[in-house]
Amino acid sequence: MATDIAAIVRHLEAFYPFRDKAVVHVGAGGGQFIAYAAHAKRVVGVDPDPEAVDRLKTAVREAGLQDRFHALQADLMTVTEKVDVVFFEFCLHEIADPAAALRHARTLAPQTVVVDPAPGSKWAWYCGEEEKVVRSWAAVDRDPPALAARFIGKQSFHDYGELAAKIGMLGEPTLTRIAEFRDRTDFEIAMPYRMALLTTG
């Protein structure tokens, strides 16, 4: 499986200047998108999943970013560190109360960057997350973002087994929805996503 992570990171770096910024990075577990941190002042990567945090620590070490990237197993709502920007990495829709998460982010930083699947995303539909995505963007759009952009990413798979290994554990309706790929090989699923910059004051 390949997500075009390098392209997403390029879009992220063009969308928001992380250089010399102190960052709280929400949903950082796994460390897939940490390349932007090479130019940041310091980053606290937050994820509640201990296994994801272990993967994040490994990614940080392999990228040589230990001097500026600290991995923290925690819920965002318990974080109190003041920074320049809070960055939600494809996770706002997974938070039970996205509006509350955004309110808490505003107590930590004057700016918030949200990257999340776009409403209408086929990938979100296969994952059974379309309602979550709509809810999270409704919370973001409650106050018009200072800056917004939309991109089309992709998820690439060699076969159905690879797809099922990635999202089959979500159960229904995902298993029924991805059944159309059972006999297909080397296919892609579009993953449109949005970026938004929220500011306080």
What kind of region is each of these model predictions?
Residues 2-21, 32:
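Conserved alpha-helix/loop element of class I SAM-dependent methyltransferases that forms part
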Residues 30, 135, 141-201:
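Conserved Class I S-adenosyl-L-methionine
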Residues 30-40:
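Conserved SAM-binding loop of SAM-dependent methyltransferases across substrates and taxa
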Residues 49-51:
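Conserved SAM/SAH-binding beta-strand->alpha-helix loop
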Residues 56-57:
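Conserved SAM-binding loop
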Residues 85-98:
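A short SAM/SAH-binding and catalytic strip from SAM-dependent methyltransferases
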Residues 99-112:
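A short glycine-rich, Lys/Arg-flanked "PGG" loop and its adjoining helix->strand segment in the class I
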Residues 113-140:
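Conserved class I S-adenosyl-L-methionine
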